[in-house]
From Swiss-Prot:
Monomer. It comes from Escherichia coli O6:H1 (strain CFT073 / ATCC 700928 / UPEC). Pathway: Metabolic intermediate biosynthesis; chorismate biosynthesis; chorismate from D-erythrose 4-phosphate and phosphoenolpyruvate: step 6/7. The gene is aroA. It catalyses: 3-phosphoshikimate + phosphoenolpyruvate = 5-O-(1-carboxyvinyl)-3-phosphoshikimate + phosphate. Pfam families: EPSP_synthase. The keyword S-adenosyl-L-methionine does not apply. GO terms for biological process: amino acid biosynthetic process; aromatic amino acid family biosynthetic process; chorismate biosynthetic process. This is 3-phosphoshikimate 1-carboxyvinyltransferase. Phosphoenolpyruvate binds at residues 22, 96, 124, 171, 344, 386, 411. NCBIfam families: aroA. The lineage of its organism: Bacteria, Pseudomonadati, Pseudomonadota, Gammaproteobacteria, Enterobacterales. Transmembrane segments: none annotated. Catalyzes the transfer of the enolpyruvyl moiety of phosphoenolpyruvate (PEP) to the 5-hydroxyl of shikimate-3-phosphate (S3P) to produce enolpyruvyl shikimate-3-phosphate and inorganic phosphate.
Amino acid sequence: MESLTLQPIARVDGTINLPGSKSVSNRALLLAALAHGKTVLTNLLDSDDVRHMLNALTALGVSYTLSADRTRCEIIGNGGPLHAESARELFLGNAGTAMRPLAAALCLGSNDIVLTGEPRMKERPIGHLVDALRQGGAKITYLEQENYPPLRLQGGFTGGNVDVDGSVSSQFLTALLMTAPLAPEDTVIRIKGDLVSKPYIDITLNLMKTFGVEIENQHYQQFVVKGGQSYQSPGTYLVEGDASSASYFLAAAAIRGGTVKVTGIGRNSMQGDIRFADVLEKMGATICWGDDYISCTRGELNAIDMDMNHIPDAAMTIATAALFAKGTTTLRNIYNWRVKESDRLFAMATELRKVGAEVEEGHDFIRITPPEKLKFAEIATYNDHRMAMCFSLVALSDTPVTILDPKCTAKTFPDYFEQLARISQPG
């Protein structure tokens, strides 16, 4: 297996221009494909997950052109639901941001298509979304294991009253919200359980509004969506930088700055993961906010005990930053780490122990006590981009670290290690 050894980093300093947000890129691509008119997306993320969405749109007959660097995409909207005339099966890798929204969107009309993906995708639950779509009339068959992909979709979603469990993934609600305006009837979506990752729903609602559709949000408990609507192209749309990707550079600055500035997101960003900067500030770093940037300067870091439900992806970065904080850090209410690209609670606990930390892994929490000195280790990444990026921070000590399968960062940030090297000074 390929590996990358990072030598100790004495200091980080500089500016990082963030690649486009994965969450925003894939939502914007699908809405542009469903919309009337031509949409130009700029600062689109070029990554595996986005390529899976683009390949799916091609198979579904959507016409688009990409710039040479794949960050500018001109899409001719379909002016309504997508039709799987020639496509029989779509392979979506491990891209939840493609699988969940497409599973809903392709239940409109009378399609007959199979959605499948990598082995890990077949372990990521989708039952709550399928249950909700079936309540709205969709005909969906599990082809292997009940409640998991692959799925056969045969259209039939017309709207109506739909209950969806919000406790596992906000992507199920996102998928329903994006699809419901195109259904022939009105849809009332009721949330069962506590809604996780609420800020990701705000991204969805924000983008739908950009594409001309507004819905009634009743305190995140119920959403009322008028049927028979259509999305309208906003013309040109700039995809903001990826706030989850920003977390590694901001944390690096908190641990070994200097000052690092990330551009492409700022105080008005629609992504909830910008709140990661508040957590670093609480730990002792100095944060400065601009309209189009966030900067972080090193501080003496202290442990925290916090509910991380609002920033599940960026919270992983706090788990490795905790290695450099004084005291025991506890991250709570993060059960949904278990159903991401890997079982992130298990993976994080296992790899933190390798570098010498004392770790308690609970059903929905992790507690981390750093060692006096970090140990050299080979870090397994579980084909999970965030594991690779999180554990790169170990090199901000006097200890090198080896990352196995470093290219797994291609899911969201293909040149992550080059960008980290650019702001790093060797120890």
